[in-house]
């Protein structure tokens, strides 16, 4: 998986601002790890990709 999304230059995914409170659930179990990718796609509308990299888990634009 790439550390970059669309126009977002993320050297580290930890730099990305997680928007939405639904991400509080993904830390519960590894089984939910596939769910975070689905949620990221839905959060895409509220994501801001650019030099500031305010992407949800850096998956904005995917």
Curated annotation (Swiss-Prot):
Which GO BP terms sit in this record?
intracellular copper ion homeostasis
Keyword terms of this UniProt record: Metal-binding, Metal-thiolate cluster
Q: Which family does it belong to?
A: Belongs to the metallothionein superfamily. Type 15 family.
Q: What is this protein called?
A: Metallothionein-like protein 3A
Name the organs or tissues of expression. Answer: Expressed in roots.
Molecular functions (GO terms) = copper ion binding; zinc ion binding
Role of this protein: Metallothioneins have a high content of cysteine residues that bind various heavy metals.
InterPro entries named in the record: MT3 (IPR044671)
Q: Which domain of life is it from?
A: Eukaryota
Q: Which organism is it from?
A: Oryza sativa subsp. japonica (Rice)
């Amino acid at each position: 998986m790439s550390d970059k999304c669309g126009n977002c230059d993320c050297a580290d995914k930890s730099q990305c601002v997680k928007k939405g409170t639904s991400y509080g659930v993904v830390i519960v179990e590894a089984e939910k790890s596939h769910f975070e990718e689905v949620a990221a796609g839905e959060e895409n509308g509220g994501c801001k990709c650019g030099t500031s990299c305010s992407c949800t888990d850096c998956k904005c634009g995917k």
